[in-house]
A protein has these predicted regions:
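Loop/turn-to-beta-strand initiation segments
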Residues: 2, 97-102
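N-terminal beta1-alpha1 ligand-phosphate binding loop
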Residues: 1-27
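Structured adenosyl-cofactor binding patch, chiefly the S-adenosyl-L-methionine
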Residues: 112-156
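S-adenosyl-L-methionine/SAH cofactor-binding core of RNA-modifying enzymes
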Residues: 32-34, 39-98
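Conserved RecA-like P-loop NTPase ATPase core
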Residues: 5, 71, 105, 138
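Conserved strand-to-helix beginnings and helix N-cap segments that scaffold or border functional pockets
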Residues: 17-20, 82-86, 115, 135
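Short glycine-rich anion-binding loops that position phosphate/pyrophosphate groups of nucleotides
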Residues: 11, 75-78, 106-109
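Short hydrophobic segments within beta-strands
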Residues: 6-8, 36-38, 103
Length: 157
């Protein structure tokens, strides 16, 4: 199973990009993993929040196939431990789905259409983090989950 992270807007902070690149490099030995960065919406000052969410939602939906298992990284989602997340990924891999797609939305969240397409919602914390930080946290947690599943000594309970 391939794991894809879809994000809106590029990661501009150098140290975050470096961390993401490091975990992507580490993940290559475990699972096909990719990050698809969608362009920021232009002229957002002229748009309402709803218009911006709709425009971003259309971009996100255009990247998905009907066969994808879609997980939104959303503050209202289920919270899992690192071990729980590894079980979540293991179940996804065992399901026979070709691709599990995790999505980080734009600054205002997701459009109703994206929520409707989602198979599940996952939250990293009750706190709010920058979208860039979530990208780093996510790639690290996927790496951690893979080491847990392989019984490797990266994770400590």
């Amino acid at each position: 199973m391939e794991i894809t992270l879809i994000t809106v807007g590029k990661t501009a902070t150098g140290y975050i990009s470096t961390g993401i690149d490091e975990y992507c490099k580490r993940l290559k030995r475990y699972v096909p993993f990719s990050i698809k960065t969608l362009p920021d919406i232009k002229n957002t000052r002229k748009m309402s929040e709803e218009q911006q969410k709709t425009a971003e939602g259309n971009l996100i939906l255009s990247e998905l196939t009907s066969a994808d298992h879609v997980v939104l990284l959303d503050e209202r989602g289920d919270m899992l431990t690192s071990r729980g997340f590894s079980v979540f990924l293991q179940k996804g891999m065992a399901s026979g789905k070709k691709r599990m797609v995790f999505v980080v939305g734009g600054p205002y969240g997701f459009s109703p259409e994206v929520y409707s397409r989602a198979n599940s919602l996952l939250s990293f914390s009750r706190m709010t983090f920058s979208h860039e930080m979530i990208r780093l946290f996510f790639t690290e947690q996927v790496y951690r989950a893979m080491t847990i599943l392989k019984g490797e000594p990266y994770h400590h309970d």
